[in-house]
Curated annotation (Swiss-Prot):
Its EC number(s): 2.7.8.26
GO biological process per UniProt: cobalamin biosynthetic process
UniProt keyword Transferase present: yes
Organism: Trichormus variabilis (strain ATCC 29413 / PCC 7937) (Anabaena variabilis)
Pathway(s) where this gene product acts: Cofactor biosynthesis; adenosylcobalamin biosynthesis; adenosylcobalamin from cob(II)yrinate a,c-diamide: step 7/7
Name of the molecule in the record: Adenosylcobinamide-GDP ribazoletransferase
Cofactor field: Mg(2+)
Spans traversing the lipid bilayer: 4-24, 35-55, 65-85, 102-122, 178-198, 201-221, 232-252
UniProt lineage: Bacteria, Bacillati, Cyanobacteriota, Cyanophyceae, Nostocales
Molecular-function GO terms, alphabetical: adenosylcobinamide-GDP ribazoletransferase activity; cobalamin 5'-phosphate synthase activity
Subcellular location as annotated: Cell inner membrane
Family note: Belongs to the CobS family.
Reaction catalysed by this enzyme: alpha-ribazole + adenosylcob(III)inamide-GDP = adenosylcob(III)alamin + GMP + H(+); alpha-ribazole 5'-phosphate + adenosylcob(III)inamide-GDP = adenosylcob(III)alamin 5'-phosphate + GMP + H(+)
Keyword line: Cell inner membrane, Cell membrane, Cobalamin biosynthesis, Magnesium, Membrane, Transferase, Transmembrane, Transmembrane helix
InterPro entries assigned to the protein according to its UniProt record, in alphabetical order: CobS
Length: 252
């Protein structure tokens, strides 16, 4: 059981990130979405370690935040950001019938570029305003973003018969499949209180806002498109991360 879990986690990391890991023959990529919140936490740990190292060296907070966001893109290979850009281009089209066609176009339009700039600015500026427990904030943001992806997969139809994200619907079929990721994020949110018992408010508000932002973001894209695609899964991740960081600037 443990070996199978580790192999599935390895497959998820290979699929969702550019982290150099050895490929093992026979990995099952059909269920990678089940462990995606855990992949988010791993990304958050890496970003937190980088941020802590730069802080130790005395690097200014704005520069640190910008470099963290740059590494964020590098670790994910821009996978989710590319999806957010394609989604923005599609939603900019007035004709609903053409939106999926525009999203499938590899060329980046003006709205896609603007959405990427907005996401990166929000992440960088929000991180700059967060002074305490940045490593934990990064873990929570990455985790909630990917739990939002699971919500989109479980709760809403997939709009393409084929596509990069089509097989995710086979891995996450119902609300029950959201519970492991939610329990994991409850545990991560509780760390705010465990490291400082005066931060119970951050724990509670972070848990409520994280789950709410993830769920509402997935619901909003479904409302606009009538379902989801692989691109909108990426958009849910990116916008959930950015908005969650913005909310935490009020609390930390």
């Amino acid at each position: 059981m443990v070996k199978l879990l580790l192999l599935n986690l390895l497959a998820s990391i290979i699929f969702y990130t550019s982290i150099p890991l050895p490929y093992i023959k026979g990995l099952d990529f059909q269920k990678v979405a089940r462990l995606v919140p855990m992949v988010g936490l791993i990304i958050g740990v890496i970003l937190g370690l980088l941020d802590g190292g730069m802080n130790y060296l005395g690097m200014p907070v704005l520069t640190r935040s910008a470099l963290v966001v740059a590494l964020w893109i590098f670790i994910t290979g821009g996978l989710h950001l590319d999806g957010a850009m394609d989604t923005a281009d599609g939603l900019a089209v007035g004709d609903p019938e053409r939106r999926l066609q525009v999203m499938a176009d590899s060329a980046t339009g003006a709205f896609g570029a603007m959405s990427a700039i907005a996401i990166l600015l929000l992440k960088t500026s929000a991180l700059t305003e967060i002074g305490e427990y940045r490593w934990l904030v990064l873990m929570a943001a990455c985790g909630w973003g990917r739990w939002g992806q699971q919500v989109a997969i479980a709760c809403y139809p997939y709009l393409k018969a084929t596509g990069k994200g089509a097989f995710h619907k086979q891995a996450i079929r119902s609300y029950k499949d959201l519970l492991p990721g939610l329990c994991l994020m409850v545990a991560v949110s509780s760390l705010f209180w465990l490291v400082n018992n005066h931060h119970l408010l951050i724990t509670v508000v972070g848990l409520i806002t994280g789950s709410a932002i993830a769920s509402l973001t997935a619901a909003w894209f479904n409302h606009k498109l009538g379902g989801h695609t692989g691109d909108t899964y990426g958009a849910v991740v990116e916008w959930t991360e950015a908005l969650f960081l913005c909310v935490l600037t009020i609390l930390t």
